[in-house]
Swiss-Prot record:
Lineage, uppermost ranks: Eukaryota, Metazoa, Chordata, Craniata, Vertebrata
PTM-bearing positions, type N6-acetyllysine: K70, K88, K144, K221, K231, K238, K243, K292, K307
Gene designation: Otc
Species of the source: Mus musculus
Subunit structure: Homotrimer.
Keywords: Acetylation, Amino-acid biosynthesis, Arginine biosynthesis, Disease variant, Mitochondrion, Phosphoprotein, Transferase, Transit peptide, Urea cycle
UniProt PTM: Acetylation at Lys-88 negatively regulates ornithine carbamoyltransferase activity in response to nutrient signals.
Name recorded for this polypeptide: Ornithine transcarbamylase, mitochondrial
Length: 354
């Protein structure tokens, strides 16, 4: 019947000399997806297919539309509790997770090193089992990826990586949602990384090719990404027909790039290396000189907090900078992660183009 109505309206419009006026009807019913993530851990995007990552971004866009745009209240996590373990301090990760989980009707519990010492006062195995009996999921922001792996192995609930020495997957989800909103699609974009070969770069390397994105990365000598991760990223690039290049020249990495990306030069726990790192990263500041060799539609991303030596004010506060929409999207993407791992909810919004 809906199909017949579409045909009648289109024919009527054509008879009056107009082009087709009815293209699609969206009834607002949940869209059934083949992707099922409930009960999974999110430790690294290496463990997820392109379709699965797309699903989390689709769900992010759906929640953002329904809650922010339409003003709906969606208690999808009512009765659920989240354990938040933070060995490292945070603004965006903590705020986005606490407010997002609560907005969906759930109860987040924040634990610092004053409350819990992973593997110190209690073994990781025991901690994982206790958390499994009292919460529905755990988000952990830790120094060592190996601690996350142990928690995931011993727990019977989903474990989410809020940041580790190797990966920061939830940040990359926010980055990709921001880019999809700005460009309309991710496929074919060239990402230009200029900075440390750190957890952010590692997470991009584990996912960009799955969306058909190219990656050009510049890091100082001695600060390159993990060789094992590079090897796997090369495999992903080959499988997906994308380009991956590594260099020590920032301008070479920026050349033709759609998205200029950098991050802190000195991560938490590296404070003793500050003088050495500042010297090694000379010439890596993102400026308008960097942008001049980028694509004409270039934009800029930084996961924050930002220091002026990493990117100057002219770029950081320019209309091309997407850093603050990127920060806001941390909330919508972590909400989507929790909903996908803890519920059977399906998006209502039509799937965006990726």
């Amino acid at each position: 019947m809906l199909s017949n109505l579409r045909i009648l309206l289109n024919n009527a419009a054509l008879r009056k000399g107009h082009t087709s006026v009815v293209r699609h009807f969206w009834c607002g019913k949940p869209v059934q997806s083949q992707v099922q993530l409930k009960g999974r851990d999110l430790l690294t995007l290496k463990n997820f297919t392109g379709e699965e990552i797309q699903y989390m971004l689709w769900l992010s866009a759906d929640l953002k539309f329904r809650i922010k745009q339409k003003g709906e209240y969606l208690p999808l996590l009512q009765g659920k509790s989240l354990g938040m373990i933070f060995e490292k301090r945070s603004t965006r990760t903590r705020l986005s997770t606490e407010t997002g989980f609560a907005l969906l009707g759930g109860h987040p519990s924040f634990l610092t090193t004053q409350d819990i010492h992973l593997g110190v006062n209690e073994s990781l195995t025991d901690t994982a089992r206790v958390l499994s009996s009292m919460t529905d999921a755990v988000l952990a922001r830790v120094y060592k990826q190996s601690d996350l792996d142990t928690l995931a192995k011993e727990a019977s609930i989903p474990i989410v990586n809020g940041l580790s020495d190797l990966y920061h997957p939830i940040q990359i989800l926010a980055d990709y949602l921001t880019l999809q909103e700005h460009y309309g699609s991710l496929k074919g974009l060239t990402l230009s990384w200029i900075g440390d070969g750190n957890n952010i770069l590692h997470s991009i390397m584990m996912s960009a090719a799955k969306f058909g994105m190219h990656l050009q990365a510049a890091t100082p000598k001695g600060y390159e990404p993990d060789p094992n991760i590079v090897k796997l990223a090369e495999q992903y690039a080959k499988e997906n027909g994308t380009k991956l290049s590594m260099t020590n020249d920032p301008l070479e990495a920026a050349r033709g790039g759609n998205v200029l990306i950098t991050d802190t030069w000195i991560s938490m726990g590296q404070e003793d290396e500050k003088k050495k790192r500042l010297q090694a990263f000379q010439g890596y500041q993102v400026t308008m000189k960097t942008a001049k060799v980028a694509a004409s539609d270039w934009t800029f991303l930084h996961c924050l907090p930002r220091k002026p030596e990493e990117v100057d004010d002219e770029v950081f506060y320019s209309p091309r900078s997407l850093v603050f929409p990127e920060a806001e999207n941390r909330k919508w993407t972590i909400m989507a992660v929790m909903v996908s791992l803890l519920t059977d909810y399906s998006p209502v919004l039509q799937k965006p183009k990726f």
